[in-house]
Amino acid sequence: MTETQSLELAKALISRPSVTPDDRDCQKLLVERLYKIGFAAEELHFGDTKNIWLRRGTKVPVVCFAGHTDVVPTGPVEKWDSPPFEPTERDGRLYGRGAADMKTSIACFVTACERFVAEHPDHQGSIALLITSDEEGDALDGTTKVVDVLKARGELIDYCIVGEPTAVDKLGDMIKNGRRGSLSGNLTVKGKQGHIAYPHLAINPVHTFAPALLELTQEVWDEGNKYFPPTSFQISNINGGTGATNVIPGELNVKFNFRFSTESTEAGLKQRVHAILDKHGVQYDLQWSCSGQPFLTQAGKLTDVARAAIAETCGIEAELSTTGGTSDGRFIKAIAKELIELGPSNATIHQINENVRLNDIPKLSAVYEGILARLLAGNAV
């Protein structure tokens, strides 16, 4: 494919050092492009976060692309082979922070819209974009706030494509049609500090927690299902003691996380953890944080359309998967009937020398255009 508009727009976005939540006028650039083809733009800013809701049309179905203009910090700049905010073509790849996650996806959807509208100026339904500068950070003032606004006025989405990088080995090989929930615990096991030579005068929280830890790590939380792997429990941090070799610690801090399927619930997991701790007589304080519930789009029209567009452009059959971390899809699903995630390779996201394959860029734009054509122009699946 010789289409170069997507590459040029991706470069323009990457050149803006939009480290979360600083948008650096990325959204302004998108508005300038989309205004020319009939999109109305609504700024929905909260605190330091910039959000934009763009829409062309007033009818249904509404096909929405969701993305984020913010990027994670670069890490040590000297370790990059080229400056992270100077998009560089090298060895058949485009390098730069945000190349994969997710400025290329945004660029590809914008150019797909430009071509689609040129060919179908009176298309069915509406096209929308929900863009935030707060996905890589706390994600408190970004997509979730925009969803609240849209929900309050009854503005719903029929089909949503989140441009997260999803490809594993080649473009189009994987579509995310759901995500696991994420539930974290911050556990403080209480003991009594003392001299290590006099254990009878102390209570060692490491020892009292050990049997419960064994049971927690061996527990089968659920078996998963057709779309989700079994729920996983992982310890991320354990810390206790003063650093001295002759002091029994007074407290033990344990941080853990569940990635849970639709076979489990937040309340159910909490209850089971408390039951195990209580069973072993652990004295503790436990604080919980749930950053996202599991969600799923059953195989249906949107997944079929996306697979057809991928097959047409990439010549492969896409796999449906719910693996990986959380995304803003967890917020959007509250107002979206069907939602998928589809973007470039995730092999280098958040890494030094983040990149995408140059020949994947026009293909991804063509895939997005193919989805629009099938949903809003009556093209056969």
Swiss-Prot record:
Gene Ontology terms describing biological process: diaminopimelate biosynthetic process; L-arginine biosynthetic process; lysine biosynthetic process via diaminopimelate
Pathway: Amino-acid biosynthesis; L-lysine biosynthesis via DAP pathway; LL-2,6-diaminopimelate from (S)-tetrahydrodipicolinate (succinylase route): step 3/3
Active-site positions on this chain: D70, E135
Catalysed reactions listed for this entry: N-succinyl-(2S,6S)-2,6-diaminopimelate + H2O = (2S,6S)-2,6-diaminopimelate + succinate
Enzyme Commission code: 3.5.1.18
Binding site for Zn(2+) 1: H68, D101, E164
UniProt entry keywords in alphabetical sequence: Amino-acid biosynthesis, Cobalt, Diaminopimelate biosynthesis, Hydrolase, Lysine biosynthesis, Metal-binding, Zinc
Co-factor: note: Binds 2 Zn(2+) or Co(2+) ions per subunit.
Binding, Zn(2+) 2: D101, E136, H350
Reported cofactor(s): Zn(2+); Co(2+)
Name of the top EC class for this enzyme: hydrolase
Pfam families given in the database record: M20_dimer, Peptidase_M20
InterPro entries: Bact_exopeptidase_dim_dom, DapE_proteobac, Peptidase_M20, Peptidase_M20_dimer, Peptidase_M20A
Molecular-function annotations in GO: acetylornithine deacetylase activity; cobalt ion binding; succinyl-diaminopimelate desuccinylase activity; zinc ion binding
Known role: Catalyzes the hydrolysis of N-succinyl-L,L-diaminopimelic acid (SDAP), forming succinate and LL-2,6-diaminopimelate (DAP), an intermediate involved in the bacterial biosynthesis of lysine and meso-diaminopimelic acid, an essential component of bacterial cell walls.
Subunit structure: Homodimer.
PANTHER family per the UniProt record, alphabetical: ACETYLORNITHINE DEACETYLASE, N-ACETYL-L-CITRULLINE DEACETYLASE
Family under the similarity heading: Belongs to the peptidase M20A family. DapE subfamily.
Full protein name: Succinyl-diaminopimelate desuccinylase
Organism: Neisseria meningitidis serogroup C (strain 053442)
